[in-house]
Amino acid sequence: MNIAVYPGSFDPITNGHLDIIKRASQVFDKVVVGILVNPDKKGLFSIEEREKLISRVVKDMPNVEVRSFSGLLVDFMKEENIKVIIKGLRAMSDFEYEFQMALMNKKLNPDIETLFMMTCAQYSYLSSSSIKQVAMFGGCIKGLVPDEIIEDICKKSNNK
């Protein structure tokens, strides 16, 4: 079985993330959306909330699973028998950072490959950080995140 992991914090998931997930799910037998647990970072949503939100968004994609992990991505991949990392790229600045990470992951486990997928132009400006900021100030996030989670983001942002 050809399995890939799409790792990230997804706080919150954006339409750019969802676009990569959809496209990757057409290439791989299974895609695992891997939510990184970073205890040093206080997110808008808890890990459990992110798992639920993403699961709701991908519920109609039978070959997509949502899991959280802590520690090194390569260790998670070894446990799950995954050999491919999917990374979305919005701009050259993303590539420089992700290229360094790909080299580090390859050094830690030579069996791992990183595949880069270009974000569709319509989503190239999106980031979870910008979504949180727009929502916090009461701006419209329709079209930026999946419709199923707009209300969750707005409620959570207004409670901050």
Curated annotation (Swiss-Prot):
Which one GO biological process term can you cite for this protein? coenzyme A biosynthetic process
Binding-site positions, substrate: 9, 41, 73, 87
Gene symbol of the encoding locus: coaD
Q: Which Pfam families match?
A: CTP_transf_like
Q: Does the keyword Cell division apply?
A: no
Q: Reaction(s) catalyzed by this protein?
A: (R)-4'-phosphopantetheine + ATP + H(+) = 3'-dephospho-CoA + diphosphate
Q: Which GO terms describe its cellular component?
A: cytoplasm
The record's similarity note reads: Belongs to the bacterial CoaD family.
> EC number(s) per UniProt?
2.7.7.3
Q: Name one GO molecular function term.
A: pantetheine-phosphate adenylyltransferase activity
* UniProt xrefs under CDD domains: PPAT (cd02163)
Subunit details: Homohexamer.
Q: Where is this site: Transition state stabilizer?
A: 17
Please give the chief subcellular localization of this protein. Answer: cytoplasm
The record's listing under Gene3D superfamilies reads: HUPs
Please list the cofactors this protein needs.
Mg(2+)
- Name the residues that bind ATP: 9-10, 17, 88-90, 98, 123-129
Localisation: Cytoplasm
HAMAP family according to UniProt: PPAT_bact
Query: Its pathway?
Result: Cofactor biosynthesis; coenzyme A biosynthesis; CoA from (R)-pantothenate: step 4/5
Which keywords does the record carry?
Answer: ATP-binding, Coenzyme A biosynthesis, Cytoplasm, Magnesium, Nucleotide-binding, Nucleotidyltransferase, Transferase
Its annotated function is as follows:
Reversibly transfers an adenylyl group from ATP to 4'-phosphopantetheine, yielding dephospho-CoA (dPCoA) and pyrophosphate.
Protein name (record) = Phosphopantetheine adenylyltransferase
